[in-house]
Amino acid sequence: MINKNDIVADVVTDYPKAADIFRSVGIDFCCGGQISIEAASLEKKNVDLNELLQRLNDIEQTNTPGSLNPKFLNVSSLIQYIQAAYHEPLREEFKNLTPYVTKLSKVHGPNHPYLVELKETYDTFKNGMLEHMQKEDDVDFPKLIKYEQGEVVDDINTVIDDLVSDHIATGQLLVKMSDLTSSYEPPIVACGTWRLVYQRLKALEVLTHEHVHLENHVLFKKVS
């Protein structure tokens, strides 16, 4: 049974669908997830702790038998899972979404300057993530696999610390984009492209939070 003293990130690790519940009430399960459910609920207004626990325990009871929980994968398999489920989809989405973000800024930015700032923030986020994921694939993940296999990797703690720092910076950019877009709520005057960009940026935020959680709270714990 999930209780108020359980750590937010650990609950999401054990029950991945709990991420949807925490997200719905604005609780960070990613870089800020190392606090208890009770402490996290106290940081938010209008979050009833008992109701939150009930929703979480409903998920526990309905957890689908046989569904894949990445926490049970070894380091090599988990890395392959992360690359297939997050790295490749993110690269593809960046390629497809960027022209729409650019168009939105160009067409509506002159009358809505925050859309220009949104594009600049998105570009920083995109370029940072692309560089970060490539470095993980080429340099960092092979080191984690070597460490799992018993080889000596002198800088393993530095590798993890640097990746976590990158994740924190990524989280800050996501917060900024969410703030600029009023949590991705398009204004009444928004055209189809505007609404499309907001919808896909929100989905990108969800994917990135899940991605970072899996690395910070599952993968890195296996090698630290």
Curated annotation (Swiss-Prot):
Alphabetized Pfam families for the sequence: Hemerythrin, ScdA_N
Subcellular location: Cytoplasm
Keywords for this protein: Cytoplasm, Iron, Metal-binding, Stress response
Biological process, per Gene Ontology: protein repair; response to nitrosative stress; response to oxidative stress
GO cellular component term, pick one: cytoplasm
UniProt main location, coarse: cytoplasm
Record text on subunit structure and interactions: Homodimer.
Cross-referenced PANTHER family: IRON-SULFUR CLUSTER REPAIR PROTEIN YTFE
NCBIfam families the record matches: FeS_repair_RIC, PRK13276.1
Name of the molecule in the record: Iron-sulfur cluster repair protein ScdA
Organism, as annotated: Staphylococcus aureus (strain bovine RF122 / ET3-1)
